[in-house]
Amino acid sequence: MASPLENLENHLEMFIENVRQIRIIVSDFQPQGQNVLNQKIQSLVTGLQEIDKLKNQVDVNVPLEVFDYIDQGRNPQLYTKDCIDKALTKNEEVKGKIDSYRKFKSNLMKELDETFPTEIAKYKAIRGDE
C-alpha cells in the first residue's frame, strides 16, 4: 500500500494531467466537445475533493519563499540551493569570527603571561592548560 505522501503525489499528478487535458480541450473548443469538457471539469472537482481529504494525512511544511519562487517563474529547487549557499556563507563568517577570537585569546594569554606570569600559571593550573 502506498504511503500517504505517495498517495497525495499521485492525486496531484492526476490533477495536473486533468488540467492539461482541459487546457487542450478549451484551446480548440468545439461545441460537440462540451460533454467531454463537462466530464473533465467534474473529474477536476472530484480530484480537488480527494486532495482535500488527503491533506490531513500528510504533514509537510513548505516555506512561503518556495511559493515566491514559483510565482516568479523560478524553479523551486533553486530555493534549496540558495538556502545552502546562504548557510555556507554564514558558516564562513562564523568560522572567521571563531578564528579571530582564538587568535585574540592566544595573544591575550601571551601578553598576560608576560605581564602576570604567576597569576597566569595559577589560572592555567586550575584550567588544566599546562
Curated annotation (Swiss-Prot):
Q: Which domain of life is it from?
A: Eukaryota
- GO BP terms in the entry: regulation of transcription by RNA polymerase II
GO CC terms: mediator complex
- Where does the record place a coiled coil? none
Cysteine pairs forming cystine bridges in this chain are: none
User: What main location does UniProt list?
Assistant: nucleus
GO-annotated molecular function:
transcription coregulator activity
* Localization of this protein: Nucleus
The record's annotation in InterPro entries points to: Mediator_Med10
The alphabetical list of record keywords is: Activator, Nucleus, Transcription, Transcription regulation
Family that this chain belongs to: Belongs to the Mediator complex subunit 10 family.
PANTHER family named among the record's database cross-references:
MEDIATOR OF RNA POLYMERASE II TRANSCRIPTION SUBUNIT 10 (PTHR13345:SF13)
Q: How does it assemble?
A: Component of the Mediator complex.
Function (record text):
Component of the Mediator complex, a coactivator involved in the regulated transcription of nearly all RNA polymerase II-dependent genes. Mediator functions as a bridge to convey information from gene-specific regulatory proteins to the basal RNA polymerase II transcription machinery. Mediator is recruited to promoters by direct interactions with regulatory proteins and serves as a scaffold for the assembly of a functional preinitiation complex with RNA polymerase II and the general transcription factors.
- The protein's name is Mediator of RNA polymerase II transcription subunit 10
